[in-house]
Amino acid sequence: MEGAINMDREEQRQKFIDIMAKFTAYTGKYLPDDVHARLKELRVQENTALARVVYDAMFEDLKLADELDRPLCQDTGVIQYFVQVGTRFPLIDDIEECLREAVKKATIIGPLRHNAVEVFDEKNTGNNVGKRIPWIDWEIVPNSDEAKIYVYMAGGGCSLPGTARVLMPLEGYEGVVKFVFDQITSYGINACPPLLVGIGIAGSVEVAAKLSKKALLRPLGTKNSNPRGAELEERIEAGLNAIKIGPGGLGGENSVMGVHIEEAARHPATIAVGLSTGCWAHRRAAIRFNPHIDYEVISHKGAVL
């Protein structure tokens, strides 16, 4: 610990980059504890041999990823970071540059598929870093000297159903439900189910879309803080499961791992809804740093980088 305390800024930067590179690569190889547990629960609930075989293939894939030290899905996604950083965290000014360097290193050590294509030029950068990518979402925490960072790998399949729109106010919450069902029944089968469905409700599309993605960061089993919101989550989850999309879209007892709603106060004349989905290989991971750049992995119990 004393050595960490006495590190100069460049040593802190290099330590942070190294940890985040390893953690980003790790995210592509191991599902978070809650997702792994939920898949086991869903497998038990299946009544058909085909559905059980699909789940068994998923677990075999996870086993091989561990044994071979390789990503669990060939599509390692576009890297996104959701950063909650204290105003007194020593590297607050360096985080963006450090994360870009971490992605370059993670691409090599993962290895991660090259998924950053520059718009208009249609050129793959070859290192998963490009204009505004990795995407970094910021939350500033006053009077804190710690940082908490979520890593999210946004694959092509699970990003496909993503959408947002502003509803007419008279459509109300039933309009929200219809919007979600129309999108999942149209595109959910192609997004590698069972899905985690994130819904954002707000007054404008950009806020609703952002909240829908943040809803995917919540641990499975958590509920919206408002009882009415929690009830709507349960209603939508039950309805989507009744469609029986099943694992891999091949039919089964469940379509989703869960439904999470996040909301912001809205304008009286508008109700905007955003939708994001996570596939069965929901690669979402969380890590916390103290001011000495020592880390704790939150999402994967006992993980050591």
Language-model segments: residues:
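Non-transmembrane, aqueous-exposed alpha-helical and coiled segments at domain scale
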Residues: E2-I199, S204-L305
